[in-house]
């Protein structure tokens, strides 16, 4: 049986629209404030970059993006707070390679695994 190309294209377009229906049923993201956890004290370069990006994202998303500085232990305190947070996209670590790559070699007994506790979202520089 031969199906004309026009019918095939209409069938594929209809299937694509049906596949997109579940996405429309989801809640709009974000529906509450987003928190950038900076694992360093306020005033440093990582904090400054986080605040600039938070200001722009607040304008773009129409939802607050809050910077929460949790400095100490070379970034481990803030990184641990993010690792323990609910993985729902509302708590994001705005950090450097220290808490993720270097500290794992320097500190014993870390409560998080930098290889499995985080998902990269973007690079900022």
Task: Name every feature range the model reports, one short phrase each.
Residues 5-10:
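N-terminal export leaders
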Residues 20-22:
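N-terminal signal peptide c-region/cleavage motif recognized by signal peptidases
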Residues 122-125:
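A short glycine-rich beta-alpha junction/loop motif
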Residues 25-120:
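N-terminal (or domain-start) structured segment
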């Amino acid at each position: 049986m031969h199906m004309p190309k026009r019918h095939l294209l209409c069938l594929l377009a209809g299937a694509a629209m049906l596949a997109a229906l579940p996405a429309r049923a989801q809640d709009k993201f974000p529906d509450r404030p987003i928190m950038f956890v900076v694992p360093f004290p306020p005033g440093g370069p990582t904090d400054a970059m986080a605040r600039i990006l938070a200001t722009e994202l607040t304008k773009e998303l129409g939802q607050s993006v809050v910077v929460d500085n949790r400095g100490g232990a070379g970034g481990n305190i803030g990184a641990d707070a993010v690792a323990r947070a609910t993985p729902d996209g509302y708590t994001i670590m705005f950090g450097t390679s220290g808490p993720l790559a270097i500290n794992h070699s320097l500190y014993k007994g870390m409560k998080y695994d930098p290889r499995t506790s985080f998902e990269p979202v973007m690079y900022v520089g």
